[in-house]
Amino acid sequence: MMSVLKKICGSKNSLKSFDNEVYQSIEKELQRQKSQLQLIASENFASKAVMEAQGSFLTNKYAEGYPGKRYYCGCEHVDKIESLAIERLCKLFGVKFANVQPHSGSQANQAVFASLLTPGDTILGLSLSCGGHLTHGAAPSLSGKWFKSIQYTVNKDTYLLNMDEIEKLALEHKPKLIIAGASAYPRKMDFKRFREIADKVGAYLLADIAHYAGLIAAGEYPSPAEYAHVMTSTTHKTLRGPRGGIVMTNDEALHKKIQSAVFPGLQGGPLMHVIAAKAVAFKEALAPEFKTYSKKVVENAKVLAQELQKHGLDIITGGTDSHIVLVDLRSQKLTGKDVVDSLERAGITCNKNSVPFDTAKPTITSGLRFGTAAETTRGLEAENFKEIAGLINEVIQGLISGNSSSVEKAVKAKVERICSNFPIY
């Protein structure tokens, strides 16, 4: 007897034959990724092994609960997979306990809030305009609505975190939770000092390492594992895995609270196909090659920042310690929106980004955020990033001179040449 799936999709059961519209859009996206330079700091190229796991039959399996304690039968194989993911993650970051079920970094943060806070509690996080994340207490986020959010900023001259000011705010407002983390801060964070401040006011310290996780795992960025009460992260970005979230801690009591907060507090059934992909990505990150890769990510970012500076562009904090490079366009009299649109037409994708104390709207901005993780995965070296810096400058100068159309066309041809020399998939 023919199965229902075969009746619906045909005997070949392929996406192309059943839904060519979706298939063509996926193919076009693949071609876009192949032919453009991806410099968005939160993006990377997952391996075929990661994507194979995520596209597996595990998408069919429902598995509410945790390994050995499921609410459904038939979970022996997914139990093994989730246990592997947890074991590998703990080894990767040197922690005792981990939850791999959060669907995203935002939900991982929400799980921590649900574990440690009650509505109305005070939290202290980095201002969105100075590089923080929405979930760190920004007004539009639930974290800014449920809790009394106090925001720390950066030094107005150096754009570096002012730890003395953070301590002053903590002593004044007595937060229950301090968040150390960012979505657009290129420099190292002093997690030891953050913990000292937290201890002075009896606060928990959450280290949101979503952007830096892969670099931390490889020893290329300071680890907060020794200092933070709890760590959260995404699993893509510099970890180069599937899109998802994780929570880690060395405190068993906190771990139990987090387990309950994730399930049944915030989520129902976990995405077992994504957890399998996470497990594969963690194994990749444990390999020696990942350390070499992460070292190159930071080296390439430093080169990109230095070369952009040579072209006369202002770099926030004067450089980078991570994969992130932030450009301040205010001296160029250009907006982030205008530049990213022009860069995209030239085959370079990045994102417009607010700079510290920006007066432009978030939909316009006065800056750019670049990241080197994806193109380093592709195989680009320092010399390639020197060339890319030149291409970025060409596009910016084209906007300034009013000759953007011809410049974009010329740069796009150069971008496609670079991409053809470094194929993906």
From Swiss-Prot:
Top-level lineage group: Bacteria
Pathway involvement of the protein, from the record: One-carbon metabolism; tetrahydrofolate interconversion; Amino-acid biosynthesis; glycine biosynthesis; glycine from L-serine: step 1/1
Compartments (UniProt record): Cytoplasm
One Pfam match: SHMT
Cofactor: pyridoxal 5'-phosphate
Catalytically driven reaction(s): (6R)-5,10-methylene-5,6,7,8-tetrahydrofolate + glycine + H2O = (6S)-5,6,7,8-tetrahydrofolate + L-serine
InterPro entries from the UniProt entry: PyrdxlP-dep_Trfase, PyrdxlP-dep_Trfase_major, PyrdxlP-dep_Trfase_small, Ser_HO-MeTrfase, Ser_HO-MeTrfase-like, Ser_HO-MeTrfase_PLP_BS, SHMT-like_dom
Primary residence: cytoplasm
GO molecular function, one term: pyridoxal phosphate binding
Site-annotated residues for Plays an important role in substrate specificity: 236
Gene Ontology biological process terms from the UniProt entry: glycine biosynthetic process from serine; tetrahydrofolate interconversion
Alphabetically ordered keywords of this record: Amino-acid biosynthesis, Cytoplasm, One-carbon metabolism, Pyridoxal phosphate, Transferase
Residues noted as binding (6S)-5,6,7,8-tetrahydrofolate in the record, renumbered to the chain: 128, 132-134
Cellular compartments per GO CC: cytosol
Subunit (UniProt): Homodimer.
UniProt-recorded name of the protein: Serine hydroxymethyltransferase
Annotated organism of origin: Wolbachia pipientis wMel
